[in-house]
Amino acid sequence: MIRPFQRILLAVTHSPAMESKTKVTSKIYGEMPNGREVKIYTLTNGEVKAKVTEYGAILVSLETPDKDGKSADLTHGYDTLEGWLTNSSYFGATVGRFGNRIKDGKFSLDGKNYTLATNNDPGGIPCALHGGIKGFDKVLWDGKITEEKAVELTYISADGEEGYPGALTVHVTYSLTDANELKWVVKATTDAPTIVNIIQHTYWNLSGDPTTQITDHILTLNADGYLPTDAGLIPTGKIDPVEGTPMDFTKPTVIGERLGADFEALKLGGGYDHAWVLKKGEGKTHFAARLMDPKSGRSMEVFTNQPAIQLYGGNFLNGETVGKNGALYGKRSALALETEGFPDAPNQSNFPSSVLRPGETYEHHLTFKFSLEK
């Protein structure tokens, strides 16, 4: 049985017309190497607490109580801004202009060829990953608290930045509801044709203990198909059915149950690092995934308007990164559930288009909803 946190339920029951309980505060987090101040924002509704910083539009932390009422941070990351400046694993970050991979770091648009930095080489095969060498995760955004008790972060990516055409104006909004939903919404416009796939890249361990693996977490994905890849983790262009394979999470499944299976996709990715094609739903967002930790009782549902979700199982975490409270983040100590457009979409005409043109608005809606299960 899934139940929201009790105190919030009581508040809603007794005062259905009351204003949101969410409070938002800000303070100086530190300084960039050039001396520019960086803010950190705290959103809390009395049960859930989220922190967001202007650097990288990063979700710094997310705390919720377990079934015994003990709160813990469920995310990987760093204690200080100085730590975040070394963030090479995209912990908590807003990544773009194009999240995920682009084959060979090349694409063509309206008859013109573009070359991006190749900053990733799975299987020894170079590709462009998560926007480039200095993507959205490594720049300073301008933040403010809105009248709606949300945090809005703005960044203008110049024409030609990291090789992408067009000046792109991006607004990212983080908000926290009384229903224990953390919402992340992106809106972007351009002054010239470009490609866009902006992704939220938080690493989750619902146990609240970053020294444990997520292999005992239970995952459900609202997807009947996934994108097989080549040795460089670039989609082949096919959509394969998950039925009868270790990629089938249509029913709640322990993540580590089939990691050792003799299956090509798992061998190529060193585990799970693939995009699943989501079933379409009604409304602005639809159910994408549910993650549950049996030990703590914590559950997280994911809703989005995007066509795919990437499950990255933390396969390349190696125990060398010193994170929060001195924790060493080992292999599979957290996972990412990245709602997204299809990887390498600019080079695959049969994939949903990632092209954004002047006069259009790119929108990515993502909701993480937290609850407890007995």
Language-model segment annotations:
Residues 18-374:
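An exposed, glycine/acidic-rich loop-and-rim segment of catalytic or binding clefts
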Residues 4, 8-20:
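Bacterial Sec-dependent signal peptides at the C-terminal "C-region" and cleavage site
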